[in-house]
Amino acid sequence: ELKNIVSHFAIRGTVSEIKPLGAGLINDTLLVTTAEADAPNYVLQRVNTNVFPDVDLVMRNIYAVTTHIRKKLEAAGETEIDRKVLTFMPAKDDETKLYAIVDGQYWRMMIFIENAVTKQAVNPESSRAAGKAFGQFQAMLADIPVELGETIKDFHNMEFRLQQLREVIAKDPVGRVAEPEVQAMLKEIDARAEYMCQAERMGREGILPKRVCH
């Protein structure tokens, strides 16, 4: 069944093994190993449509972002570009699509970046490297020439998030609102609420430009 899903994508090489990869909480992720030494291995993902209902929009955003970053890296004379930006594989039936629908499920494939690791334990060195990577990401996308779509409505809208919180507090579904520890956290949030919503207001007023968020 998994090999059938892979067959919907325009990849190089013959599939020799497919096994789970990583411990992600949102999408189902698999490593696709190829038999040929000159063919890359791949990552196969089933996109969670409960979280991302508009997969086409998600993938169009990804295409815009990765294409822009790739051009920036090429212009800067960077080496090993395929290690620095993701390469998604087109669907066989439509090379403009970076996903395939198989039995109602949405799948995507990308080239696997060999010898890459995910840090589970945080230390100052890793934090510094992560901060640098996010900074480079933001800098490269500051002049992206297209407007990306909002994949999860109001995901970063703190006014909306605080309203959600207040509605849950009013209902108190598990009877914990009165607990001292919970009250302390709620007071802390309330004290910072004005500041938390400042960016949203400044964005509406045109003071802050929209930026791409990872």
List each language-model region with its residue ranges.
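Conserved hydrophobic/aromatic beta-strand scaffold that supports enzyme active sites
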Residues: 29-31, 107-109, 212
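Residue-level detector of alpha-helical secondary structure
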Residues: 4-5, 28-31, 61-68
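ATP-binding glycine-rich phosphate-binding loop
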Residues: 11-35
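Juxta-kinase regulatory segment immediately upstream of eukaryotic protein kinase catalytic domains
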Residues: 1-19, 69
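Short beta-strand element of the conserved SAM-dependent methyltransferase core
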Residues: 32-34, 110, 189
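ATP-binding pocket architecture of kinase catalytic cores
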Residues: 37-61, 67-148
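Short N-terminal amphipathic alpha-helix/helix-capping patch enriched in small hydrophobics
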Residues: 14, 25-28, 40, 58-62
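ATP-dependent phospho-/nucleotidyl transfer catalytic cores
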Residues: 19-23, 45-46, 52-56, 113-128, ...
